[in-house]
């Protein structure tokens, strides 16, 4: 059908516009092919199509009904349709990596909870004895320890000097720091532990396979994180984003992946609406709610990253940072936790937009690389 449409003499490209919903990823190949063939292509937010022209009591959901609805939307908004332009390769790869990173992070959390639950049956409380962070290869001390010492009997069935020497060799073999106090803490925990399951081959398989699964997923997470930072460093706004407080080599590439090129947003309110942290006005007659909920109709991945950035402000409390000053003022006013956190995220996003717009304005030769994929006019 596409080949026939491109080669059709009846199709006047200057007067033909292709409008589609940008659902998932399967629309991108079609939109790119038609765009390269010279057609005007517009990818519309599915929510705008869903809420458009809902003037019937019947709920019909067929391909034909959806096509008619999209066509009516296109005719009514003909002058406001935005031409689709494919995203450049770096930003596209960065966004894809970020989505895989977020998925792997969820899987790592689930795998860690699963391993902790299994250890509560064979070695309860061992997780709290270690606080080492995840290394660049995805390994973590408590996970490797659980793989080798998967039951309390692996520790308490031998004298403390023998366990201490074995633990010292284990730390050297896995390149971990040996602490005598840590060995004493683990041995004391094993001595007083009350376990549900006895030492058996089944318990060994369960714990070790859960540990292997967690290590594998953690390694994937760290690979994604390093690759995202490498790709983000190729973008022109990388030094400006990384110079902002609360943004490091993990959160910076995530922000750049989800926001894209800020020049595609006409003003800062559009970026706030894109993130879904804009307040929804609630007024009817004499009712006028002053504390409104956020719309949450934007990218959930972007909102999660913003929340983590603001949590960094909350933990470090930089007194000279405008975002923290704004957050602290809202907290002093007695606002609830999520209210002042979202307000601070809104403030951070506006500063992000202003800094990058000023930076891009200083680069006269730099061209925009990716336009906004949705019609934001209705979201503002």
Predicted regions and their residues:
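Glycine-rich, often acidic, oxyanion-interacting loops/wings at catalytic, nucleic-acid
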Residues: 101-238
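A short, charged helix-loop
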Residues: 71-96, 189-194
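Short alpha-helix plus adjacent loop in nuclease-associated cores
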Residues: 35, 42-83, 151, 287-297
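Single conserved hydrophobic/aromatic residue that forms the stacking wall/gate
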Residues: 1-12
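Short glycine-rich phosphate-binding loop at a beta-alpha junction
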Residues: 15-26
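Basic, amphipathic alpha-helical segments enriched in Lys/Arg and hydrophobic/aromatic residues
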Residues: 331-380
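Phosphate-backbone recognition surface of nucleic-acid-processing proteins
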Residues: 163, 170, 239-243, 249-333, ...
């Amino acid at each position: 059908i596409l080949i026939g449409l491109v080669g059709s003499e009846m199709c006047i490209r200057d007067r033909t516009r292709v409008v589609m919903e940008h659902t998932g990823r399967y629309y991108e190949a079609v939109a790119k092919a038609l765009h390269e063939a010279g057609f005007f292509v517009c990818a519309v937010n599915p929510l705008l199509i869903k809420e458009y022209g809902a003037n019937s009591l019947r709920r019909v959901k067929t391909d034909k009904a959806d096509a008619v609805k999209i066509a009516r939307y296109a005719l009514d908004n003909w002058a406001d349709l935005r031409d689709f332009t494919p995203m450049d390769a770096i930003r596209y790869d960065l966004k894809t990596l970020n989505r895989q990173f977020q998925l792997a992070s969820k899987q790592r959390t689930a795998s860690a909870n699963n391993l902790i639950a299994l250890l509560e049956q064979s070695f309860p409380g061992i997780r709290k004895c270690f606080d080492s962070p995840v290394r660049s290869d995805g390994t973590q001390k408590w996970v490797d320890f659980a793989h080798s010492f998967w039951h309390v009997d692996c520790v308490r069935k031998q004298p403390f000097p023998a366990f201490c020497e074995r633990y010292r060799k284990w730390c050297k073999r896995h390149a971990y720091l040996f602490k005598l106090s840590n060995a004493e803490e683990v041995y004391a925990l094993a001595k007083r532990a009350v376990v549900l399951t006895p030492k058996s081959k089944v318990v060994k398989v369960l714990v070790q396979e859960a540990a292997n699964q967690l290590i594998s997923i953690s390694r994937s997470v760290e690979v994604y994180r390093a690759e995202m930072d490498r790709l983000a460093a190729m973008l022109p706004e990388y030094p400006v984003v990384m110079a902002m407080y609360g943004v490091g080599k993990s959160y910076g590439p995530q922000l750049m992946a989800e926001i894209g090129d800020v020049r595609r947003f006409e003003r800062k309110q559009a970026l706030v609406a894109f993130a879904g942290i804009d307040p929804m006005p609630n007024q009817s007659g004499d009712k006028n709610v002053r504390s409104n909920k956020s719309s949450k109709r934007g990218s959930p991945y972007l909102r999660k990253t913003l929340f983590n950035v603001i949590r960094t402000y909350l933990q470090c409390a930089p007194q000279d940072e405008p975002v923290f000053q704004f957050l602290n003022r809202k907290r002093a006013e007695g606002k609830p936790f999520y209210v002042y956190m979202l307000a601070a995220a809104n403030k951070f996003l506006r500063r992000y937009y202003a800094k990058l717009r000023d930076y891009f304005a200083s680069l006269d030769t730099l061209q925009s690389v990716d336009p906004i994929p949705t019609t934001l006019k209705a979201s503002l």
